[in-house]
């Protein structure tokens, strides 16, 4: 009798595990459908098919807290804790298109957040490229590392640092993506951008503008406004508040 009870228990656990696996598979299928609908809606913001395909491959629900799961595929910013947000998908797509990311690029991101933006950029730079993403809030840096690892992104390095100074350790960069608003374009970031490189950065306090910065082969800087935006403020030496 004890042996039979043991067998029944094992079977019960197996059935429970199978049920859990089924629920996970169903959730992934549903998320895939929602992601497809989301990306279809982005076609009014973005025309680069490579960017749209990258957005389609990244499971956004794996990069948001449990309490935001229901809104993972709504085109809106979501809170991720510590006064920070994950950008709306259309903004992520627009910034990636502005950056003109390509296979093999080395990219610096200021503001890792949950790791979602880095994951999308990772898809665009491929296995020969690399994303270095800087996050000043330790719990968020750990959250981003966990999310990226579980989602299988191996060409992304999360660095616990204050990003207002950039990250000279791996400079110069082909591209720089800044996901927090600065009072102006930090000179130190311009110095870390390769000749021929592109940076995208929101500039301003309450009324912000997204700026595309291009450094030509001679080092000359060109700036172009790409629209009004709202981002959390940059904190640090070149931000709105020093720490």
From Swiss-Prot:
It is an enzyme of class 2 (transferase). GO terms for cellular component: cytoplasm. Keywords: Cytoplasm, Methyltransferase, S-adenosyl-L-methionine, Transferase. Coiled coil: none annotated. The active site is at 87. Its EC number is 2.1.1.77. CDD domains: AdoMet_MTases. Belongs to the methyltransferase superfamily. L-isoaspartyl/D-aspartyl protein methyltransferase family. NCBIfam families: pimt (TIGR00080), PRK00312.1 (NF001453), PRK13942.1 (NF010549). HAMAP family: PIMT. This is Protein-L-isoaspartate O-methyltransferase. It comes from Methanosarcina mazei (strain ATCC BAA-159 / DSM 3647 / Goe1 / Go1 / JCM 11833 / OCM 88).
